[in-house]
């Protein structure tokens, strides 16, 4: 059923409007009280941020030196598994292919056992197994990326 404009000639709507429906009959009026308060709060926040930036600027670290990079540079924590793949795989092309396989694999996850309409994970063994294996491999690669030595990063320093 399509939406239609309310007709103000309709007696039911006229009666509701006469009883005060659709009007704020309680509290403070929006204009000018709320509008003025909103403006004061917004401008006060902007001026406060500018004052903090001017009076107490953030201290910058030492300047970057492109000829003296640290030995152990790590990306952000959410890139650890991909970083470990690139670090461990000897062939650059294979590393790029494996990195491209990650979003492709994630895009295919909804189609695994799509015919099985059960929501209980114990009744969807293939999807549950893929999820658990993916989680374990991702955690393994993420923990291994934090270890600087590549042979130790493959065994997580356990052997």
Swiss-Prot record:
An example Gene Ontology biological process: photosynthetic electron transport chain
Xref: SUPFAM superfamilies: a domain/subunit of cytochrome bc1 complex (Ubiquinol-cytochrome c reductase)
Domain of life (superkingdom): Bacteria
Key words, A-Z: Cell inner membrane, Cell membrane, Electron transport, Membrane, Photosynthesis, Transmembrane, Transmembrane helix, Transport
PROSITE patterns linked: CYTB_CTER (PS51003)
Transmembrane segments: 35-55, 93-113, 127-147
A GO cellular component annotation in the UniProt record: thylakoid membrane
GO MF annotations, alphabetized: electron transporter, transferring electrons within cytochrome b6/f complex of photosystem II activity; electron transporter, transferring electrons within the cyclic electron transport pathway of photosynthesis activity; oxidoreductase activity
Membrane topology, record value: Multi-pass membrane protein
Subcellular location(s) of the protein: Cell inner membrane
PANTHER family referenced in this protein's UniProt entry, alphabetically: CYTOCHROME B (PTHR19271:SF40)
Family the entry assigns: Belongs to the cytochrome b family. PetD subfamily.
Quaternary structure and partners: The 4 large subunits of the cytochrome b6-f complex are cytochrome b6, subunit IV (17 kDa polypeptide, PetD), cytochrome f and the Rieske protein, while the 4 small subunits are PetG, PetL, PetM and PetN. The complex functions as a dimer.
Task of the protein: Component of the cytochrome b6-f complex, which mediates electron transfer between photosystem II (PSII) and photosystem I (PSI), cyclic electron flow around PSI, and state transitions.
Identification of the protein by name: Cytochrome b6-f complex subunit 4
